[in-house]
């Protein structure tokens, strides 16, 4: 029997109990946070007709999978210029899951859901019409990736889960077809986050899949204390072996080849939860960061020859500054300080702080968690999906985190912690982060998990859609972020992949302020976001330069671009 006080505490329970019984950390969610008068986020879920409730099918057996889902995506599946919403769901579990029993998604309550945005901004559930309803027994959905893998101009969906993944091809007529078997991307085991990227710059999107632990209903263990002395709890991942990640190469004919072993991805084993992509060393090839849960995080350097080298330890991002592992969950790989080099942020459990690694430009990263203000603002929280985006369009990327402890029993063993937590927003002021409360939703507690980001109403500021464990999803509209000027950039590749994923964009505003972006859909936790880039311009009415470095190597420039519009850029032939 394993003792669990916090999720990590079964190994060192007395230490964690005594540490927190004497800790002087406020559990008030509003203490030490600043209010922001100019920008508010408004919960508009009900008025948009979004009625999704995540069904994790919690049981008394504390099956580990119950506490880990679900994800979401913001993407325009029908090319009408309006973002649509996809949310993943769990499955019906029996209590207990007897030999031979499988998760069951046949009941509509457990379906993943696709919501199409109407012309008036409301949404209609089109799941069944789109061919995305139900699923045979044995499948429990986790995350979602978005990308146009066949370059036909329509965004496809890849849904991860327990005991198999699904690739849905977008037919271009409002429907999807399950092509998993033909494509050869079914995976296996417990897959978590996934993302499309072009690792060999051949113009076709490849697919990276993170996998968590080698767990099954049969191997699920009893963790915690037996009643009446204590309560049963979800087991720490140390109770289970890790799994290898999967790299699928796009063959260009609708099929993929598993290149994990040949490319150097299959070793070592990890406990992957989040994945993100960026070219951290500027060599023109996209690298991969995997957030692992309580084992070393992985940074896969792309060698440019179809192989990767795992350099997390050497680069300084495998462990925290004390040389310890942490419970890596959500991840973003983006330039927070506008120096042209993508940095790494990783969410974590309470007591540990979220990690921020600054890219030093020499292949190394420096842990700036405390110096940046992120450490002090996050010590008492547990974070999942995260994203660096400029919510107030002042030119600095701010940090959002969907939050909740992983243990629904945490308050019984650690009274200073909370299971339900409000989302977190840290405002970036010239590279230093301070917590802000931009509206009532940031004082409301949820079981946050996945979150996706994008401009739902095309007004130039970023909105948020979050999927909450066992709760209703929410949509937060950004009200006031467009008071500052902004420039949206939507690109289409010709020689490069059609989505332009992996393209690097530099924006120089009229005053000379410079920002850098990487075109991506994958980041956070189990989720996929709008591929369009939004650059906050502050009071500047123009961008004097927009420079796009395509994955093909082509460099494209636009000059004197007016603010408050979406610039549409098509990759030139040379």
Regions inferred by a protein language model and the residue ranges of each:
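Beta-propeller blade termini
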Residues: 69-79, 116, 141-154, 169, ...
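Repeat-based blade/solenoid architectures
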Residues: 50-71, 108, 130-145, 184-195, ...
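Hydrophobic beta-strand segments that make up the repeating blades of beta-propeller
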Residues: 85-89, 152-161, 207-211, 283, ...
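Beta-propeller blade signature
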Residues: 110-118, 243-251, 301, 357-358, ...
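Bacterial N-terminal signal peptides
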Residues: 13-28
């Amino acid at each position: 029997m394993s003792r669990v006080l916090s999720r990590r505490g079964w190994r060192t329970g007395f230490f964690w109990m005594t540490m927190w019984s004497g800790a002087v950390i406020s559990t008030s969610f509003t203490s030490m946070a600043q209010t922001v008068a100019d920008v508010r986020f408004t919960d508009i879920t009900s008025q948009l007709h979004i009625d999704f409730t995540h069904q994790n099918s919690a049981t008394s057996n504390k099956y580990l999978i119950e506490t880990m889902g679900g994800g979401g995506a913001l993407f325009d599946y029908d090319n009408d210029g309006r973002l649509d919403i996809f949310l993943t769901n769990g499955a019906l579990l029996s209590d207990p899951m007897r030999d031979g029993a499988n998760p069951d998604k046949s009941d509509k309550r457990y379906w993943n859901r696709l919501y199409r945005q109407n012309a008036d901004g409301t949404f209609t559930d089109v799941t069944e019409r789109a061919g995305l309803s139900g699923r045979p027994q044995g499948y429990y959905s986790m995350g979602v990736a978005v990308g146009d893998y066949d370059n036909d101009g329509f965004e496809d969906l890849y849904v991860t889960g327990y005991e198999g993944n699904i690739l849905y091809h977008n037919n271009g007529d409002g429907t999807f077809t399950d092509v998993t078997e033909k494509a050869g991307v079914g995976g296996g085991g417990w897959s978590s986050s996934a993302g499309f990227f072009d690792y060999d710059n051949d113009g076709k999107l490849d697919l990276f899949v993170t996998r968590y632990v080698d767990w099954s209903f049969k191997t699920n263990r009893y963790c915690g204390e037996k009643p009446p002395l204590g309560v049963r709890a979800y087991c720490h991942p140390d109770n289970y072996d890790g799994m290898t990640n999967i790299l699928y190469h796009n063959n260009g004919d609708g099929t993929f080849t598993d290149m994990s072993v040949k490319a150097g991805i299959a070793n070592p084993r990890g406990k992957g939860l989040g994945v993100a992509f960026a070219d951290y060393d500027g060599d023109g090839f996209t690298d991969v960061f995997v957030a692992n849960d309580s084992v070393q995080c992985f940074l896969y350097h792309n060698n440019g020859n179809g192989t990767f080298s795992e350099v997390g330890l050497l680069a300084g991002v495998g462990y925290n500054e004390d040389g310890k592992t942490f419970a890596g969950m959500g991840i973003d790989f983006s330039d927070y300080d506008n120096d042209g080099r993508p940095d790494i942020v990783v969410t974590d459990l309470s007591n540990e702080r979220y990690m921020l690694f600054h890219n030093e430009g020499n292949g190394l990263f420096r842990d700036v968690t405390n110096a940046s203000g992120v450490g002090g603002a996050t010590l008492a929280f547990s974070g999942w999906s995260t994203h660096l985006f400029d919510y107030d369009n002042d030119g600095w990327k701010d940090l959002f985190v969907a939050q909740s402890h992983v243990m629904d029993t945490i308050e019984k063993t650690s009274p200073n912690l909370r299971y339900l937590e409000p989302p977190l927003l840290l405002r970036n002021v010239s590279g230093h982060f301070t917590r802000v409360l931009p509206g009532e939703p940031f004082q409301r507690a949820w079981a946050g998990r996945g979150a996706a980001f994008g401009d739902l109403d095309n007004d130039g500021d970023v909105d948020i859609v979050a999927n909450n464990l066992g709760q209703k999803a929410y949509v937060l509209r950004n009200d006031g972020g467009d008071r500052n000027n902004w420039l949206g950039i939507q690109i289409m590749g010709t020689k490069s992949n059609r989505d332009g994923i992996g393209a690097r964009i530099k924006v120089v505003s009229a005053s000379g302020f410079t920002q850098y972006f990487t075109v991506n859909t994958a980041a956070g936790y189990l989720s996929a976001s709008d591929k369009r880039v939004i650059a906050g311009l502050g009071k500047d009415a123009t961008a004097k330069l927009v420079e796009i470095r395509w994955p093909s190597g082509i460099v494209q420039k636009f000059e004197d671009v007016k603010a408050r519009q979406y610039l549409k850029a098509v990759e030139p032939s040379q």
